């Protein structure tokens, strides 16, 4: 099977936005106009093509980034629809890793919102070129220039309109192209028929003004164009487009477009802009990787002739075909039925079938080419972030970093039959989502699940019940506290057991001290003269690390400490690894009374957006939750409160905010750092945990 679309005519894009900016609807329209769907599904009717999990259709939000493929003007566009809710930023992070470009969708009334800032920052980290689509121009309060301004004010982005709307709200009739200076008027409800006319007289001045400042902004990124501009020479449309493309690819400039996906206006022009300004796989630098075992850096250019390399960026359990692994091919080609190497796990994998995904329907293909996104059936050992490569040309591509979960709940099966099913289902869900963890509490035997927020865990439990038919009861959410030391001390750990026959003997002196915040655990061996034999040193480190998992104060993991092993003794016959492991854990317990242990709680960065009149109530509420207000700013007609609040005080906040603001307030929160818990609360937690 020959390649249908050349690499130069391929685009891998993501669509990213704040929740409710109209991202899924925009994707729907793209699929409609590119001939992939025959009937348009509305998100608010729960019938959207991309939102294919039942929970997504009910809640009207996008949870998993479904990958789909479409064709436009003899190009292939692979689209990844990413979720806009902050609990799912891992999905965004994961998809940005494999994209070449992105469309940021903004709400024309609100402009840049908190989650837009989060995904924008993530896209900047990965150097992803972006165009901006200002959606909902038909909405009451829509203001194109205000929304464009928020890109500069809130994100510091060099963003500039390359289009302007004709009218707004109910009077939104068409779009002016600021490059060609043509006006497009829409003639039917589906937006499939439009006609090009002259710019209406009342818009002419504004259009010319915006075009002049567009040329100026683009000229600043291109020396040749700057010279022409300064010398007053005419700049042709083609020159302008080429310069915009180059500046966009360099992530120096962001073209801004407008429309209303719901009213079917502006989507085709936005698709044109995807082809005109966003990169093909050949426009982005070749991906870097290392050769396993040597740490030698190599690059894998986008080409079918290079050795095969791909990154698995999502694993899903599909009711029909089982485990589906989504991957992006960076170089070479992959045939179904072939063998590849998972270089991260050093495992050989057989690729059963290769599927090209379209939201939740699929088409089987025999070969995936470089630059393409597809899904494989039959990979047993591959998880998110793993590299798949040619067995003779091993490489490990840059992987992804995922945040630690911050919230946990206990979950119990309803019946004995549910118990076995639950274990299998939870491990499948954990395989799909690296920010979801499942573990068994060794003391209580309870199953604990952890994730990025209440909504995240709600949806996991929901999926257990629906997809895996597991009956389960969920406890109250628990905060993932941590412990650390504030003081340092030298302590002894001695484990001696002599009771006839071979005994046990391990003896260590360890200095424990605080480490820098975020530096983790550090172990230093300062043994001189073999007072603790070399072969037992790893056991000492292991003994300390294993004990750290259960802390010294209230049973929470100890973090950011340094342990220096500097003295000890051993017995020729009775010493062994186990004895030194136990001695090391005894030393850690002895440090409890000397190293001033403290409890740390996760602090969340919270942003609350509310109408002015509710400010007083919101500030009072944040303070009553032990929150620290960091700042306030006006955002359009609303006020934004930025604060740090302990996670333990944020449970049920969504409900409180709704009732405090009559449903008009919204908030986002994500984990920021750990802070020492106040003494009274620490005592309460210690008592509670001791009493259990």
Curated annotation (Swiss-Prot):
The organism's taxonomic lineage, starting at the top: Bacteria, Bacillati, Bacillota, Bacilli, Bacillales
Gene it is expressed from: fusA
Gene3D superfamilies: 3.30.230.10, 3.30.70.240, Elongation Factor G (Translational Gtpase), domain 3 (3.30.70.870), P-loop containing nucleotide triphosphate hydrolases (3.40.50.300), Translation factors (2.40.30.10)
Localization (cell): Cytoplasm
GO molecular function: GTP binding; GTPase activity; translation elongation factor activity
Pfam families reported for this sequence: EF-G_D2, EFG_C, EFG_III, EFG_IV, GTP_EFTU
Protein name: Elongation factor G
Highest taxon listed in the record's lineage: Bacteria
GO biological process terms held by the UniProt record: ribosome disassembly
Organism field: Oceanobacillus iheyensis (strain DSM 14371 / CIP 107618 / JCM 11309 / KCTC 3954 / HTE831)
């Amino acid at each position: 099977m020959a390649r249908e679309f050349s690499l130069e005519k391929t685009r891998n894009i993501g669509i990213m936005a704040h929740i409710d900016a109209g991202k899924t609807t925009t994707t729907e329209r793209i699929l409609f106009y590119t001939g992939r769907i025959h009937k348009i599904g509305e998100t608010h009717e729960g019938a959207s093509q991309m939102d294919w999990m039942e929970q997504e259709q009910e809640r009207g939000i996008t949870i998993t980034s479904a990958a789909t493929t479409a064709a436009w003007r003899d190009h292939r566009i692979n689209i990844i629809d990413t979720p806009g809710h902050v609990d799912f930023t891992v999905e965004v992070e994961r998809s940005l890793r494999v994209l070449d470009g992105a469309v940021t969708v903004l709400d024309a009334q609100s402009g840049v919102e908190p989650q837009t800032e989060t995904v924008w920052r993530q896209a900047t980290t990965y150097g992803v070129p972006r165009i901006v689509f200002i959606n909902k121009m038909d909405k009451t309060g829509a203001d194109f220039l205000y929304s464009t301004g928020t890109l500069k004010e809130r994100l510091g982005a060099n963003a500039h309109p390359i289009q302007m709307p004709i009218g707004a709200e109910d009077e939104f009739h068409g779009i002016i192209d600021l490059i060609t200076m043509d006006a497009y008027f829409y003639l039917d409800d589906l937006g499939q028929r439009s006609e090009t006319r002259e710019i209406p007289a009342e818009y002419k001045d504004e259009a010319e003004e915006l075009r002049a400042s567009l040329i100026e902004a683009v000229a600043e990124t291109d020396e040749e164009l700057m010279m022409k501009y300064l010398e007053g020479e005419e700049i042709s449309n083609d020159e302008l487009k080429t310069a915009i493309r180059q500046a966009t690819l360099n992530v120096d400039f962001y073209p801004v477009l407008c429309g209303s996906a719901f009213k079917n206006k502006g989507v085709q022009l936005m698709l044109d802009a995807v082809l005109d300004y966003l990169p093909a796989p050949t426009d982005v630098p070749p991906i870097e990787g290392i050769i396993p075992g040597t740490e030698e850096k190599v690059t894998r250019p986008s080409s079918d002739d290079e050795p095969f390399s791909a990154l698995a960026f999502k694993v899903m359990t599909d009711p029909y075909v089982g485990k589906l692994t989504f991957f992006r091919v960076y170089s070479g080609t992959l045939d179904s039925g072939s063998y590849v190497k998972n270089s991260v796990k050093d495992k050989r994998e057989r690729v059963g079938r290769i599927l090209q995904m379209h939201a939740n329907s699929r088409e089987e293909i025999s070969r995936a080419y470089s630059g393409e996104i597809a899904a494989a059936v039959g990979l047993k050992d591959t998880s998110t972030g793993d590299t798949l490569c040619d067995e003779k040309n091993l490489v490990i591509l840059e992987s992804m970093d995922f945040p630690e979960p911050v919230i946990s709940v206990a979950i119990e099966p309803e019946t004995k039959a549910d118990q076995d099913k639950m274990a299998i289902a939870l491990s499948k869900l954990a395989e799909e989502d690296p920010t979801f963890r499942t573990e068994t509490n060794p003391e209580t035997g309870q199953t604990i699940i952890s994730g990025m927020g209440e909504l995240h865990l709600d949806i996991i439990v929901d999926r257990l019940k629906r997809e895996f038919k597991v009956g389960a009861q969920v406890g109250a959410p628990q905060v993932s506290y941590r412990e650390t030391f504030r003081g340092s001390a030298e302590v002894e750990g001695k484990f001696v057991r002599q009771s006839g026959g071979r005994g046990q003997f391990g003896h260590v002196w360890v200095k424990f001290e605080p480490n820098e915040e975020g530096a983790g655990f550090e172990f230093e061996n300062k043994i001189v003269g073999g007072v603790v034999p070399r072969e037992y040193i790893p056991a000492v480190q292991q003994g300390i690390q294993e004990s750290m998992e259960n802390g010294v104060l209230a049973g929470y993991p100890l973090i950011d400490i340094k342990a220096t092993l500097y003295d000890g003794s051993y017995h020729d016959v009775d010493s062994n690894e186990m004895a030194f492991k136990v001695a090391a854990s005894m030393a850690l317990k002895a440090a409890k009374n000397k190293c001033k242990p403290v409890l740390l709680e996760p602090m969340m960065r919270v942003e609350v957006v509310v109408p002015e009149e509710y400010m007083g109530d919101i500030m009072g509420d944040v303070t009553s939750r032990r929150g620290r207000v960091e700042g306030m700013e006006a955002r359009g007609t609303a006020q934004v409160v930025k604060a740090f609040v302990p996670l333990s005080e944020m449970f049920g906040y969504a409900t409180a905010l709704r009732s405090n603001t009559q449903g008009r307030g919204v908030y986002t929160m994500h984990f920021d750092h750990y802070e020492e818990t106040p003494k009274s609360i620490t005592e309460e937690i210690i008592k509670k945990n001791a009493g259990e």
